[in-house]
Amino acid sequence: MATEVMQENVETAANVLNHWQGHRRVTRRTIDAFPEEKLFQFAVGGMRPFADLVWEMIRMVMPITDGVATGKWEEFKGEKPETKSELLKVWDAQTKALDERFPTIPQHRFSEVDTAFGQWTMTGLATIQYGIDNEIHHRGQGYVYLRALGIEPPHFWERD
């Protein structure tokens, strides 16, 4: 008698997108918690201001998504925002673009190995996870800044 093994893929593209967008919602609330001047100027221990860290996140989101989708790895093109409202406007536009673009990634691209931006050789899914991990890491720096400013950061588990 043969035993049949069923494998269920619980890491669907929709789950990955939902997970990523959950983190993006928390990061957006983190950006919003900063006073305008502190967002662009305050830093601790020689680290960059949070606005610079957010700009790095912004410069990764769509290039990673498009690169995984197409295999073409192009740098982000856009002007760096100079105000909190401009930064949030770019963030929100990317959130919408991510919702539109992510579902078009061909399923096979998640498991294909590629070299993103000529430097990271990994599967498409791992590249996306790298982008998410980078956001979490930098948001953690933002939490330290907020606490140093006497501001309670948003709860990281509230992703809605």
Regions found by a protein language model. Give the residues of each.
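Helix-adjacent hinge/juxtasegments
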Residues: 66-104
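Short, contiguous alpha-helical
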Residues: 2-3, 13, 17-31, 36-79, ...
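Secondary-structure transition/hinge residues
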Residues: 35, 99, 103-106, 150
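Soluble or luminal CAZymes and related metallo-dependent hydrolases
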Residues: 8, 19-23, 90-93
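Acidic catalytic patch
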Residues: 103-118
